[in-house]
Amino acid sequence: MPAKQRTPKVNRNPDLIRGVGKYSRSQMYHKRGLWAIKAKNGGVFPRHDAKSKVDAPVEKPPKFYPAEDVKKPLPNRRTAKPTKLRASITPGTVLIILAGRFKGKRVVFLKQLASGLLLVTGPFKINGVPLRRVNQAYVIGTSTKVDISGVTLDKFDDKYFGKVAEKKKKKTEGEFFEAEKEEKKEIPQVKKDDQKAVDAALIKAIEAVPELKTYLGARFSLKQGMKPHELVF
């Protein structure tokens, strides 16, 4: 590609000799159209005021940055979005737990908490599953349902299941070398009473349906030859 040729600037008032132009000052005044600019602004050339100078800072900024620069915290723009509940899971649906301590147990779904976890119970009196939170990824929804209209669930939220932080006691020299005995944590009486109240309302609805109590008490398991993808729950 050939290089672009530079076009030399043409002076509108070429010099006849050094310091003497071809056109006079008045001729260049008309040639450059300055008369039109003056007439447009009421017989006066437009003036552009100089920009105001910024006041000098009282203290000079440091010449060098510190070696350990403090990181600026980034703004948190995350918004809490509610977890979508599966269409097969509705209040009162009997679920099968697939993992954890109560794997294979059938439980009754009560409601979805703000964190997205499911509030379920056995009931405890039937199969030993207390009021607990379960992720919906680890349950199978069945077609069996229990009427939970008589169960009061207003007080149950994520804070209800939170653990109370305990202060660690400082050990003496003798206690440090002794084998630490694990103390059995006792369940608060309030939670025991809440479990009994929920169980009483659920068992009343369960006993109204024949063989539902036996169904909830039985543990789910796959036998040889059973294909889980072909089962209808």
Swiss-Prot record:
Region annotation (Disordered) ranges: 48-80
Extent of Basic and acidic residues compositional bias: 48-72
GO BP, sorted A to Z: translation
Xref: Pfam families: Ribosomal_L6e, Ribosomal_L6e_N
Annotated keywords: Ribonucleoprotein, Ribosomal protein
One Gene Ontology MF term: mRNA binding
Keyword Protease: no
UniProt keyword Ribonucleoprotein present: yes
SUPFAM superfamilies in the cross-refs: Translation proteins SH3-like domain (SSF50104)
Domain of life, source organism: Eukaryota
Gene3D superfamilies xref list: 2.30.30.30
GO cellular component: cytosolic large ribosomal subunit; mitochondrion; plasmodesma
PANTHER family: 60S RIBOSOMAL PROTEIN L6 (PTHR10715), LARGE RIBOSOMAL SUBUNIT PROTEIN EL6X-RELATED (PTHR10715:SF10)
Family designation: Belongs to the eukaryotic ribosomal protein eL6 family.
Protein name: Large ribosomal subunit protein eL6x
Gene name as annotated: RPL6C
